[in-house]
Amino acid sequence: MSQDQEIKRGYSTYTRRGLGLTFGAASFALATTTGTLMAGNSLQSSALSLEESLQIALRAIGSDVANAAADHLAKSAISSAALNLHLRNAQMTASDVKLIANALDRTTVSELARLVSFSLSYNAIGDEGASTLAASLPATLTELGLVGCSIGDQGGGAILEWAKYANGLRMICIEDNSMSDQMRKQFGSLRDMSVFV
């Protein structure tokens, strides 16, 4: 068993994630921070990078925004220290979220830790998509945007449970969804972060 597999086995799904890329509906921009790149050991050399895993998922989704994001990732010669992925208004569904979640699940712990900010705002992912996403997001994520995603109490509950264990989370935007007042109040009780519900 590789070192990464051993580490993943010891962590829950809520503590295994970390990533970041930024793409908008009409345009996209890759936001990176400079950092020192270190070569992985031989056990990790066959694993896909975060960018490679995401390219596969984005091409399978096939929307204009997803394809543009995949093209931009393909042109990136070097992985950055941090990645912000914003796929707003990308016409994504719960099925598309499964592709993104699978890409995250295929990525090593060290690669996932690079995800900083993630947004699927204004995509009709619903409860199913929100629940799928909650099971794959890294606990190191600092910002999450799920505005106007047709999320009800079931999906909201899954995101809320993930957020309780996401020790890196500093801001969550989940307004304009179909959650009950009671669920909104539960989000309001999250501490040490900005919550927009």
PLM regions with names:
Residues 14-20:
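N-terminal export leaders
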Residues 1-14, 28:
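N-terminal secretory signal peptides
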Residues 20-197:
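Leucine-rich tandem repeat or coiled-coil scaffolds
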